[in-house]
A protein has these predicted regions:
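Catalytic beta/alpha-barrel core
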Residues: 14, 127-136, 151-163
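Glycine-enriched alpha-helix->loop->beta-strand junction motifs that scaffold or abut catalytic
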Residues: 33-35, 142-153
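N- or domain-start disorder-to-order transition segments that initiate the globular core
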Residues: 1-24
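Conserved, mostly hydrophobic/aromatic
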Residues: 40, 100, 131, 146, ...
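An N-terminal structural lobe/cap that precedes and organizes the functional/catalytic core
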Residues: 20-56
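Active-site beta->alpha loop and helix N-cap motifs at the rims of alpha/beta catalytic domains
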Residues: 43-140
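Short, charged, surface-exposed secondary-structure boundary motifs
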Residues: 47-48, 162-168
Length: 168
């Protein structure tokens, strides 16, 4: 039995890396060890700088600015993770999600967070994607607006019950 089957508990993988997606990630999904995954800029930075799997795409993107390069690499991996998790999501709408975080520099900019959240969600174009938003005053506004548009949201950086309540 699994935690999901035993107590309806879903584990999410907090790691994304291109080679991992094609090997262990597939395996732990198949074995029902995880039911979703999340990412953030720090995870991607570590993956991109420590894996040769990104070299070809990095070479093709080298003329772009850092944000564009990061987004292209991250979106490629998020789209792949969404595809790998899609069967889980089809079988249980509460599972099979992958999340991508908005630019952390937007944490105090509700309008910027909303704009970026809509853009990221649209560019990935998968029902099982969540936009990860920090639990700040601006983030609460963005969370409400994005969910009203039918965009899945993953609240992050919650350190108190008060913050958690404000995310609803």
């Amino acid at each position: 039995m699994s935690l999901k089957e035993d107590i309806n508990f879903s584990l999410w993988c907090d790691f994304i890396e291109r080679d991992f997606l094609e090997t262990r990630f597939k395996e732990i999904i198949k074995k029902k060890i995880i039911q979703g995954a999340t990412s953030n800029p720090a995870i991607f930075e570590s993956s991109i700088t420590n894996s040769l799997a990104y070299k070809q795409q990095l070479d093709m993107l080298q003329a772009n600015n850092a944000k564009t390069i990061y987004e292209e690499l991250a979106l490629t991996d998020i789209k792949r993770a969404a595809a790998l998790l899609s069967d889980l999501h089809k079988n249980d709408a509460d599972d099979g999600f992958i999340s991508i975080e908005v630019d952390p520099l937007l944490c105090d900019d509700a309008a910027g967070t909303i704009e970026e959240g809509v853009r990221l969600y649209s560019s990935i174009s998968a029902d099982n994607v969540m936009i990860k938003i920090p639990a700040t005053q601006a983030g609460y506004i963005a969370m409400r607006e994005l969910t009203s548009k039918g965009i899945n949201v993953n609240a992050t950086l919650i350190f108190s019950p008060e913050q958690a309540i404000k995310c609803t």
